[in-house]
């Protein structure tokens, strides 16, 4: 009788514990993970990022300071990946992954950094601020881009436009601002290389 009672008590505790564990619902992320990809020519361009919301805040010049580099997303690093070699800002980049950092400006052009190190921007912290010189030293390329005003965009979004299927336009849009850079998939160069093999 004692064994039966002990068994029933143990079984009850296991069932209640299991139900309680299943009843705990994980909250949705405030800045959900997002992914966008596009094939342009022979190249697949992919971006993995987290998508923060405006939530009534002033974004650029507010929570994102002018003149300070930013990880161009939330939570972790924003990563762009090219499946083949490409050209950005007139500089050839090898296939692979790069961190995207953006330095917004109150007026004029912004700087978009494609950084060789797929690490957190916080690895560049020095005395409580981003060490801009150290970050720039690790850039694969930094391009200047003029921001434009767009319709309200609550969540940060990236878009990749295939254009003429040779050169892609990569755009970051958030709040009422968009900024873009071009990625040349080097289709003509790759075609010439292919033809030269025969």
Predicted regions and their residues:
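Bacterial Sec-dependent N-terminal signal peptides
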Residues: 1-26
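Short, ordered coil/turn segments that flank beta-strands lining enzyme active or ligand-binding pockets
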Residues: 21, 40, 88
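Primarily secretory-pathway and cell-envelope proteins
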Residues: 24-65, 117-198
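Aromatic- and Gly/Pro-rich amphipathic surface segment
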Residues: 61-76
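Mid-length scaffold segments of soluble, non-membrane domains
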Residues: 72-126
């Amino acid at each position: 009788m004692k064994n039966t009672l002990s068994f029933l008590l143990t079984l009850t505790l296991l069932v209640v514990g299991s139900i309680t564990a299943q009843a705990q619902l994980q909250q949705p992320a405030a800045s959900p993970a997002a992914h966008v990809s596009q094939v342009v020519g022979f190249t697949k361009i992919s971006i993995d990022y987290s998508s923060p919301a405006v939530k009534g805040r002033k974004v650029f010049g507010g929570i994102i300071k002018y003149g300070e580099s930013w990880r161009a997303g939330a939570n972790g690093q924003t990563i762009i990946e090219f499946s083949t070699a490409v050209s950005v800002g007139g500089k050839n980049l090898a296939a692979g992954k790069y961190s995207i950092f953006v330095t917004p400006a109150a007026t004029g052009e912004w700087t978009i950094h494609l950084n060789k190190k797929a690490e957190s921007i916080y690895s560049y912290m020095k005395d409580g601020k981003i060490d801009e010189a150290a970050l720039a030293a690790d850039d694969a390329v930094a391009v200047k881009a003029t921001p434009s005003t767009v319709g309200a965009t609550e969540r940060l979004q990236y878009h990749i436009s295939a254009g003429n299927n040779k050169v892609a336009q990569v755009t970051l849009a958030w709040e009422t601002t968009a900024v873009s850079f071009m990625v040349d998939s080097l289709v003509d160069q790759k075609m010439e290389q292919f033809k030269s093999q025969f």
